[in-house]
């Protein structure tokens, strides 16, 4: 007890430890063997006295001790040279070092190595030091017991963007309502000047607390009386979302400042999604007449026919009906539906329109139909009682149709955009109750055989818009005036439609063979009038060939079935100078040739460009008259030539008037006839023949020429024209 009193008296003089000094004699300038050690020499006077203090180590009450050297003071009294707190230095030791009892080298106090192991939270040789700066994501701080007048500071720092959460595992400090004796103080920052979050004392474990930044400062302070077990805390770096602050399955979203916000599910609100929104719904508007509606999964159609806010209804119509209005409606927050309720209207989808067809929607008109029943009522009853109207078009239902649809009974009118085309199919079509259109789909095809201002006496000046010129490359042609690879006019044919030309088969095959010449070595020219190839004509169209189809019965020896179809790679542009010729039906074949005008036309194949007037030479034409096949065979036999005129051929001779400018053996060409037409008062021209064979040199008008009878191949031609 006396030892503890002494200790409390001398604590106030601890500052003398490093500054107290006394005059000493010269004999003490070296080690004085009478003192505990060399460290005491400068503090000793004439004589050195010492006494031994006995203490107990807290671990097992092990006896420990140390020596306090003393000196005589001015009054010759024994006075402590070094003031020491006594046994309190051992209180924080977990295990103690033991000195030499009474020995001269007992130097615990000078060396400061009283303890070999410290209690938790303490360190140093005397286990009196505590506190540190901690930079870690998580950890713990424990202070196991504590002495009087202790002061410890800890600074906890975690990564930027995080906050520090502090949790208490144990608290045992002297209790005071104001916590002004023994306490643990927590500040929101990294130093003692930061804002105080809380001061703790007593033994009731506090709730956890959290910093606003990435650091906390802890200060422990004890006074000079009473000591307890200390405290134990853990810390961890956290984000605002670590504590799962969002209720009702809300999603926590952290930001860089350590704060957070909650993304709430539908039906919840508040900072933590803690408020439940009163669920609203919309009354089911039902499906439109002649239609139906679809609800998405989870729309929540209740027994009371209500649909949850946020869901949409999609509307559809039955066949032959079209939706007018909103295709979908959404249930809004105010329990109201977006848009207006749609209706299903009888309508027809506009039919597809072919090329060159012009479609026009006719204005709404009353359509009248009188049935036999109308006549019966009109005849049987008086006018006053039977004012019966004919059937008529009903009023249009309300609502607009989407683009591409027309109301019931709407009429569409069709015509062609070009005067060179004629319409096939219906001129008008009506929208029916079935949702389909009446009539047949219209299309526009080129007008065939149209030739205006024809004059039989002026054949040399006439243009034949269906005349097609076939050119071949000059490879292998023995003509010095032609360079290799240049184009040579070889035959004439006729344009049947925008992609088809008919030609004699011997023009597109190797001489005396059925093998077809490469299409890359041939081309077709339309709109041609002058023979000279160097004479530029704006009306000309030079077209590549995609395929050549020779009649399968073609005989290159007898020239039987001498006919072929040329398919054009690109469409021919129909104009005043380029038009197709008509094909003749078998029933339209000429029975009385003298009653009709039959013309052969073509260009002279072999032409001398040096001859006078060659630049102005045009297509040649002349009238012909068919003759009997036997008569034709007999004439050739009389001229020493044996020929056979088959059913696919016919023979003809030139008429003397008007004077012809053509020689079939030099030009080849096509034969056309002018027949009456129900659509044109001028008639229309029909293809009846292709020049096939004849005399090789003589051009006498009485000599016969063999032609391919085109009407025989009408079905084959139409099949390959598609």
UniProtKB/Swiss-Prot annotation:
Q: List the disulfide bonds.
A: 130-152, 179-201, 241-252, 246-262, 264-273, 282-331, 317-344, 416-444, 491-507, 632-651, 663-699
**EGF-like domain: residues covered:** 237-274
Task: Give every Sushi domain span.
Answer: 280-346, 393-446
Signal peptide start-end? 1-21
Under PANTHER family, the record lists: INACTIVE SERINE PROTEASE PAMR1, PROTHROMBIN
InterPro entries for this protein: CUB_dom, EGF-like_Ca-bd_dom, EGF-like_dom, Peptidase_S1_PA, Peptidase_S1_PA_chymotrypsin, Serine_Protease_S1-Domain, Sperma_CUB_dom_sf, Sushi/SCR/CCP_sf
A GO molecular function for this record? calcium ion binding
**Classification lineage:** Eukaryota, Metazoa, Chordata, Craniata, Vertebrata
Q: Which residues are glycosylated?
A: 98, 318, 455, 616
> Which residues are in the CUB domain?
130-238
For this entry, the protein name equals: Inactive serine protease PAMR1
Q: What does this protein do?
A: May play a role in regeneration of skeletal muscle.
What GO terms fall under cellular component here?
extracellular region
Q: Does the keyword Secreted apply?
A: yes
């Amino acid at each position: 007890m006396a030892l503890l009193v002494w200790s409390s008296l001398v604590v106030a003089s601890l500052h003398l430890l490093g500054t107290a000094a006394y005059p000493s004699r010269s004999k003490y300038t070296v080690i004085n063997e009478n003192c505990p050690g060399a460290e005491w020499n400068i503090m000793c006077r004439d004589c050195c006295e010492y006494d031994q203090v006995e203490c107990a180590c807290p671990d097992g009450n092990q006896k420990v001790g140390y020596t306090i050297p003393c000196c005589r003071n001015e009054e010759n009294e024994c006075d402590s040279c070094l003031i020491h707190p006594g046994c309190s230095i051992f209180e924080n030791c977990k295990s103690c070092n033991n000195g030499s009892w009474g020995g001269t080298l007992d130097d615990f106090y000078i060396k400061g190595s009283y303890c070999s192991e410290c209690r938790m939270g303490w360190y140093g040789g005397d286990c009196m030091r505590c506190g540190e700066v901690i930079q870690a994501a998580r950890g713990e701080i424990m202070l196991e017991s504590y002495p009087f007048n202790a002061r410890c500071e800890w600074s906890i720092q975690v990564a930027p963007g995080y906050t520090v959460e502090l949790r208490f595992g144990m608290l045992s400090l002297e209790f005071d309502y104001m916590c002004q004796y023994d306490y643990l103080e927590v500040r929101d920052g990294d130093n003692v000047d930061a804002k105080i979050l809380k001061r703790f004392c007593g033994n009731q474990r506090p709730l956890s607390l959290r910093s606003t930044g990435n650091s906390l400062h802890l200060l422990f302070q004890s006074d000079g009386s009473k000591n307890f077990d200390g405290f134990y805390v853990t810390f961890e770096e956290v984000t605002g979302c670590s504590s799962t602050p969002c209720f009702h399955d809300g999603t926590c979203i952290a930001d860089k400042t350590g704060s957070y916000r909650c993304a709430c599910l539908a039906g919840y609100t508040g900072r933590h999604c803690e408020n439940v929104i009163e669920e609203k719904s919309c009354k089911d508007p039902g499906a439109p007449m002649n239609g139906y509606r679809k609800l998405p999964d989870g729309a929540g159609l209740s027994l009371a026919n209500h649909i949850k806010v946020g869901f949409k209804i999609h509307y559809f119509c039955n066949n032959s009906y079209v939706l007018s209005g909103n295709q979908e409606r959404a249930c809004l927050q105010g329990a109201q539906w977006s848009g207006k309720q749609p209706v299903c209207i009888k309508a027809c989808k506009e039919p597809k329109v072919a090329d060159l067809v012009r479609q026009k929607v006719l204005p709404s008109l009353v359509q009248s139909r009188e049935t036999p029943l109308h006549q019966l009522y009109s005849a049987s009853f008086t006018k006053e009682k039977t004012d019966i109207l004919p059937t008529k078009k009903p009023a249009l239902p309300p609502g607009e149709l989407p683009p591409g649809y027309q109301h019931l009974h709407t009429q569409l009118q069709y015509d062609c955009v070009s005067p060179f085309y004629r319409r096939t199919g219906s001129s008008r079509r009506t929208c029916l109750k079935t949702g389909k259109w009446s009539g047949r789909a219209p299309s526009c095809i080129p007008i065939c055989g149209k030739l205006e201002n024809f004059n039989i006496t002026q054949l040399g000046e006439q243009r034949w818009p269906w005349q097609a010129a076939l050119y071949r490359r000059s490879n292998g042609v023995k003509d010095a005036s032609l360079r290799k690879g240049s184009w040579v006019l070889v035959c004439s044919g006729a344009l049947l439609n925008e992609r088809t030309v008919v030609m004699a088969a011997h023009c597109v095959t190797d001489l005396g063979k059925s093998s077809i010449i490469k299409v890359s070595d041939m081309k077709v020219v339309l709109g041609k009038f002058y023979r000279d190839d160097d004479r530029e004509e704006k009306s000309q169209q030079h077209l590549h060939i995609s395929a050549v189809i020779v009649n399968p019965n073609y005989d290159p020896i007898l020239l039987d079935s001498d006919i072929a179809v040329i398919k054009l790679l690109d469409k021919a542009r129909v104009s005043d100078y380029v038009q197709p010729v008509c094909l003749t039906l078998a029933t339209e074949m000429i029975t009385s040739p003298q009653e009709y005008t039959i013309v052969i036309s073509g260009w002279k194949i072999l032409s001398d460009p040096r001859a006078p007037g060659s630049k102005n030479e045009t297509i040649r034409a002349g009238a012909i008259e068919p003759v009997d096949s036997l008569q034709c065979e007999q004439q050739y036999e009389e001229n020493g030539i044996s020929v056979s005129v088959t059913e696919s051929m016919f023979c003809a001779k030139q008429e003397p008037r008007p004077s012809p400018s053509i020689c079939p053996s030099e030009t080849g060409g096509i034969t056309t006839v002018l027949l009456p037409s129900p659509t044109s008062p001028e008639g229309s021209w029909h293809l009846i023949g292709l020049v096939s064979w004849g005399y090789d040199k003589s051009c006498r008008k009485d000599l016969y020429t063999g032609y391919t009878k085109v009407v025989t191949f009408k079905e084959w031609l139409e099949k390959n024209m598609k």
